[in-house]
């Protein structure tokens, strides 16, 4: 028969033992029904089996004194491969009782089981065979398939809850021997199951009572700590109350002083406001007087405009009369048949005069267009006059047309003159008379035209006067605008003065508060000086006994000065602290001074 490889037989035996130990641990833990501790036998045997599995095929490391095999090296490698394992490595290194690498490895296995991550950690090791080859031989269990099978079996241990105390155990000196009797069935085991059930129930009751005892002890300790904290807070509150009473007395004095200062400031502000009101009223009166003068100027200008409008209405009436006269001239021109040439000369002269009138009207119109918005009414009147002149020009054009008709009639008349020469001779005397009358009418028209020229000159002079009045009004309006600007500037200066006044009031209030604080500090210093002058600081040599309890001082019973009265007391009679006027911080005070100062603070309270 062929001999088997002894290393393969060792691996198979270790695999079978691992299966039996893991299976027995899971079954017993589930039947046990509670968390496992370090004294549980199946759990101890499981760790022994795992230790043998990890030691199989481990390379020996030569040291100076001995030749050791340790499993801590590959387990320490897990930290680099699995970052979550850093906590286990750090906690194992921090354990004080462990001195050997084997003890650290055993503690590492127990912590990994409690975390339920032993299978994950060992799986990382098995995958990295190149790194494991530094620690294990090629035929080791961790390098072969049996190691992967054991890692798969370890996943079932996640069902178990274990609470192991690693600090108290002696993991360095334990002997790892596998107890095969646990895995061999006997008749006695069947009878002992009932005993184990009873023992488990008793252990459960024991654990329950221990947990209750722990909870009660924790509650009692927490209550003691609360009582101590409440006593300390009570003493602090009493001291703070005394300090608060002193502060309240000081604040009441400050309040009285501030009220008096506030009343003085109110009186000053009222006086200042009355003065400012009088100034504002005077400014308003001056503004009203200036406004009345401007209103009077405006009314005068309106009156002048009304007078000019009446004058222009009179001129329009005269123009209407002249238009009627021109109509009469048209009727007279029909009768002027023979003296057409002379009448043409006169008409040419009249045309020149009309062109001059038109040029004058155009100049007036241009000047009126250059005038400002305040002369719109005058522009409208001039436009009306221009319309009337246009009507006159149209009438003259009609006269020209009629003259052309008269020329035609003249030609016809020349033909008829030859026939009716005798009749004309008879009528010539009458016509000469009429011509003389027409000449007189022409003279009258020339005089009327001269009158119109003079009237237009007067209108131009009136326009210049109105322009002067407008310039004067503009100058006055500019003065009014400048006065308004000065008034606004004065208002801004008034507001700035008010702001400066308010800022000065705030500064005075702050100075008042600071002065009050300095006065209070000076009073406290004076009281402290008075207290120091009245007190006598007792020397250490002069005191041999406590003034209150009259116990003798020794090395254990030290001397303490009271900062208020200057006497020397023991620690028990001077275990009090209060703020004094001489020192803002709390200082040591004897019992009698402490009671006296608290009574004084309570009497000073309102």
UniProtKB/Swiss-Prot annotation:
Residues that coordinate or bind Zn(2+) 2: 562, 565, 590, 593
Pfam families, alphabetized: FYVE, RUN
Keyword Zinc-finger attached: yes
Gene3D superfamilies recorded: 1.20.5.170, 1.20.58.900, Zinc/RING finger domain, C3HC4 (zinc finger) (3.30.40.10)
Keywords: Coiled coil, Metal-binding, Nucleus, Zinc, Zinc-finger
Domain RUN, residue spans: 37-169
Superkingdom per UniProt: Eukaryota
InterPro entries xref list: FYVE_RUFY2, RUFY1-3, Run_dom, Run_dom_sf, RUN_RUFY2, Znf_FYVE, Znf_FYVE-rel, Znf_FYVE_PHD
GO molecular function, one term: zinc ion binding
Binding locations of Zn(2+) 1: 546, 549, 570, 573
Coiled coil: 210-267, 294-515
Keyword Nucleus: yes
Entry's localization field: Nucleus
An annotated GO cellular component: nucleus
Residue intervals of every FYVE-type zinc finger in the record: 540-598
Subunit description: Interacts with BMX.
Protein name, as recorded: RUN and FYVE domain-containing protein 2
Source species: Mus musculus
Taxonomic classification: Eukaryota, Metazoa, Chordata, Craniata, Vertebrata
Gene of this entry: Rufy2
